[in-house]
Amino acid sequence: MNFNTILEEILIKRSQQKKKTSPLNYKERLFVLTKSMLTYYEGRAEKKYRKGFIDVSKIKCVEIVKNDDGVIPCQNKYPFQVVHDANTLYIFAPSPQSRDLWVKKLKEEIKNNNNIMIKYHPKFWTDGSYQCCRQTEKLAPGCEKYNLFESSIRKALPPAPETKKRRPPPPIPLEEEDNSEEIVVAMYDFQAAEGHDLRLERGQEYLILEKNDVHWWRARDKYGNEGYIPSNYVTGKKSNNLDQYEWYCRNMNRSKAEQLLRSEDKEGGFMVRDSSQPGLYTVSLYTKFGGEGSSGFRHYHIKETTTSPKKYYLAEKHAFGSIPEIIEYHKHNAAGLVTRLRYPVSVKGKNAPTTAGFSYEKWEINPSELTFMRELGSGLFGVVRLGKWRAQYKVAIKAIREGAMCEEDFIEEAKVMMKLTHPKLVQLYGVCTQQKPIYIVTEFMERGCLLNFLRQRQGHFSRDVLLSMCQDVCEGMEYLERNSFIHRDLAARNCLVSEAGVVKVSDFGMARYVLDDQYTSSSGAKFPVKWCPPEVFNYSRFSSKSDVWSFGVLMWEVFTEGRMPFEKYTNYEVVTMVTRGHRLYQPKLASNYVYEVMLRCWQEKPEGRPSFEDLLRTIDELVECEETFGR
């Protein structure tokens, strides 16, 4: 952790009111910003005076608050906001210059965070609602597009006449590396789709020129060619950055690791993955001779010494200064492992991640570039077909039936939805809006709908595979929650399965654009009552916490291998039962631990339910815990 101070100043903070009963007050605090923490103290910057802190990596948005000459009940009149986790901290600076400096420095520190918001609330949360859009849910999605890289909403004041005579000195660099060139390494190949794109070749280095967009960066290759590249296809060239190594799999749980190692079926197949304990790593290793002639898996935690400098080891007698050195050593020496690390197993080079659109700022797709193939199915909006874009990339194409959707609203929102990019979300690539019917072009998922996938393979799933499916969905939903985006119709039917068995969340937010009253009215025959909490079927109050309820029902669908919730009851009967406290029964394949997670999702009051962040932490622990599966 780097404790070098970037900024330090006495500011005023408003209480975050994390609970409804929390008082609203304003207190003077000493704020200290470092590379890793924003901390505030009462009086002096000493641990015993610390009143609170925010992990910089958890910050999703920093911006000036628009107040429109409203009353500010404290002496500092220049507010800005720091959005983190599920909370917003309002801070008041003594001058516009002070505020601009804090916003600028904070934005510099969060520019590489992977949780930056798509939309935010530009005005205060006051008296139970946002002053900008009057939404009454604190976790309601933002109402204005947020661009981390744009300058603040307030124009800089013109310099005083005497300062025009000479240029101000350059700012003092925080660290030498801030002024150095940023070199990245391509983790995947990328073919340039448009003239302004730059081709990527796996393993090659590139110089970053601009980061004006979270998802697309401007870069230069070794030949001097310049263009835009997808930011999730490259990683920083640093000795401690594991992403550049073939054997490292960032988002890989125990169950998925075993599936991948088993499919390769090579003696000594291995990978390094993130442990369920944050900041730690696990080596997953496959052997065909795991004892008594059977094949098996071994999972070794990479341990750290308490000495300085810190060292890492799998076998205590063989400690090294870095993780790559450990791997290199054990490639040649078993040294306490069941076998040496012979063959790196990875998804890199096989399944490149999706991109936010096919190219930088390309969201309108020319229909002549689409080739239509077989029909995949039909839904609320119309027929879905397998197709190809430019005869090369497989895509799913939804032809929107006339009168099925509020098209104008959706087209505007599509630009925002395209920027929602996560390995566990079905990617929206673009739309065709210049003709009727309009087309929605998304990522193609080979194994189709999760509900059908479960039903067609009943009796063939292990408990850990089922839990891994829930983990996939929870990861996607945690990303939506982080970006203040509500799904509104989460269910197994609205999740899709890839060729590799990865489950991804689909159709997020689409329920808002349905025009069918039978679907949108809680009394309609098509309304998904069986997936809805009381506040939705009674008052149509959607939030991330209503999505959490639906996630609990989805977990139940998964662990019953695709059964219909409350299958013997009508929607009216379900409303009555749920209102009286009745909940779905425990599936046979669900352990007590897993069913307990479902019950937490079905708490009557929204505030009693966990966040997706909490759920993901719990499920991660269950996935890693062998006892859960009775092994």
Swiss-Prot record:
Q: Does the keyword Repeat apply?
A: no
Where is the SH3 domain positioned along the sequence? Answer: 179-239
EC annotation from Swiss-Prot or TrEMBL: 2.7.10.2
Q: Which residues form a coiled coil?
A: none
Annotated keywords: Adaptive immunity, ATP-binding, Cell membrane, Cytoplasm, Cytoskeleton, Immunity, Kinase, Lipid-binding, Membrane, Metal-binding, Nucleotide-binding, Phosphoprotein, SH2 domain, SH3 domain, Transferase, Tyrosine-protein kinase, Zinc, Zinc-finger
Keyword Electron transport in annotation:
no
| Effect listed in the UniProt record for changing R563K | In a lung adenocarcinoma sample; somatic mutation
Cite a single Pfam family from the UniProt record: SH3_1
The UniProt record lists the Protein kinase domain at 370-623
Q: In which tissues is it expressed?
A: Expressed in a wide range of cells, including hematopoietic cell lines like myeloid, B-, and T-cell lineages.
Ranges where the record places region Disordered: 157-178
Cofactor: binding comment: Binds 1 zinc ion per subunit.
The protein's superkingdom reads Eukaryota
Cofactors needed by this protein, per the record, are: Zn(2+)
Question: Which cellular component terms (GO) are annotated to the entry?
Answer: cytoskeleton; cytosol; plasma membrane
Q: Where is the PH domain?
A: 4-111
Its recorded reaction(s) are: L-tyrosyl-[protein] + ATP = O-phospho-L-tyrosyl-[protein] + ADP + H(+)
Question: Record-annotated residues binding ATP?
Answer: L376, G377, S378, G379, L380, F381, G382, V383, V384, K398
Q: Which Gene3D superfamilies match?
A: Pleckstrin-homology domain (PH domain)/Phosphotyrosine-binding domain (PTB), SH2 domain, SH3 Domains, Transferase(Phosphotransferase) domain 1
Q: Where in the cell is it found?
A: Cytoplasm; Cell membrane; Cytoplasm, Cytoskeleton
Notes on how activity is controlled: Activated by tyrosine phosphorylation by a wide range of cytokine stimulations. When T-cells or B-cells receptors are activated, a series of phosphorylation leads to the recruitment of TEC to the cell membrane, where it is phosphorylated at Tyr-519. Also activated in response to SCF. Integrin engagement induces tyrosine phosphorylation of TEC in platelets. STAP1 participates in a positive feedback loop by increasing the activity of TEC. SOCS1 is an inhibitor of TEC kinase activity.
Q: Which residues carry this modification: Phosphotyrosine?
A: Y206, Y228, Y519
The text of the family note is:
Belongs to the protein kinase superfamily. Tyr protein kinase family. TEC subfamily.
- Name the UniProt record assigns to this protein: Tyrosine-protein kinase Tec
Gene giving rise to this polypeptide: TEC
